[in-house]
Each structure stands twice: as C-alpha cells, then as structure tokens.
Amino acid sequence: MPQSPIPTTEVIIAADCWQDQPDAEDVIHRAILAAAERVDAEVGDAEIAVMLTDDAGIRTLNSNWRGIDKPTNVLSFPALQPTGPRGDDDAPRMLGDIAIAYETMRREADEEQKPFDHHLSHLTVHGFLHLIGYDHESDAEAEEMEALETEILAHLGVPDPYADRERLD
C-alpha cells in the first residue's frame, strides 16, 4: 500500500483565544496535505507539531530562539535530522514544529480584509515549507517560496496572498 504523503500532524491549542476557531485544526490538516502533495516531499513517515498560541506565547519563542522580543505571526522550528539511515525504520521522524499566534494573525487578516481561514492556510503552508528547507533570506529564495505558496493555496481555493503588493524582481 502506498504511503500517505501527509505527515502525522498534532495540533496543540496552547491559548484559549483559539477556541472561537473550531475549524482551525481541519484548515491546518488540509493546508499541510496540499503542501506535501505539491512539493512531493517524502514526509509521510514524519511528524509535525503545530502549536496554536497567542502573542505572549509566540513573543517568548521569538525572543528565546531568534533574539527578537516581539510577537510575530508564525515561527517554524525544523528538526535536525541525521542524513543517514535511521536506527528504527518503524519510528516516525520529527519534521519540526510550527507556532502560530492568534492575535497577530487575526489582526493581519482583518487589515488585509481576508478570511481568517485563508490566512491560517497561508501561514500553515509557509511554516511547512520552512520545515522542509525553503527560506526567504534572499530575493530569489523569497520569489521561489512565494510562488510555491501561491500555487499550493490556489489548490485550496485561497487567493494569492501576495497579489496586493509588488512581486520581487
């Protein structure tokens, strides 16, 4: 039987503010599935943890891990995996963690006049791509990552999140 392309995804609700978004977990699972299928990543045997937190929680993470003492919308923490064969072929490998901040995400969605679920899909796809090695440190990397995000989101019925700003040249 072929392996599922979607990693096992555990969604952890770490802040009560997420309680008014009962569909958040389904949105996250759909976004990760769409991203994994599009990039044809071999992640079906992997695990991801997605923590739904608040601005205070993500500010602490951002400060501790990046030295930036302010909240942000999403953080990704790729797991460091050995490049050789694993010792236990039956044990799932950890792909990494994603943290998403409710208040920052809500504010951005409101400011950009986009549905909350669309913005959650975008941040989930963005975080997943970081876990599998994509980045946006250079203009070329950003252009590649944004184009991939836009393509994945289109399959989910989410409009291009970058349409209202100039593309990088």
Swiss-Prot record:
Protein known as: Endoribonuclease YbeY
Binding site for Zn(2+): 126, 130, 136
Gene Ontology CC, one term: cytoplasm
SUPFAM superfamilies linked: Metalloproteases ('zincins'), catalytic domain
Cofactor: Zn(2+)
Keyword Nucleotide-binding set for record: no
Cofactor comment: Binds 1 zinc ion.
Gene source species: Bradyrhizobium sp. (strain BTAi1 / ATCC BAA-1182)
UniProt keyword terms in alphabetical order: Cytoplasm, Endonuclease, Hydrolase, Metal-binding, Nuclease, Ribosome biogenesis, rRNA processing, Zinc
GO MF annotations, alphabetized: metalloendopeptidase activity; RNA endonuclease activity; zinc ion binding
Summary of the function given for this chain in its UniProt record: Single strand-specific metallo-endoribonuclease involved in late-stage 70S ribosome quality control and in maturation of the 3' terminus of the 16S rRNA.
Family stated for the protein in its record: Belongs to the endoribonuclease YbeY family.
GO BP, sorted A to Z: rRNA processing
Cellular compartment(s): Cytoplasm
EC number(s) from the headed UniProt entry: 3.1.-.-
InterPro entries to which the protein is assigned, alphabetical: MetalPrtase_cat_dom_sf_prd, YbeY, YbeY_CS
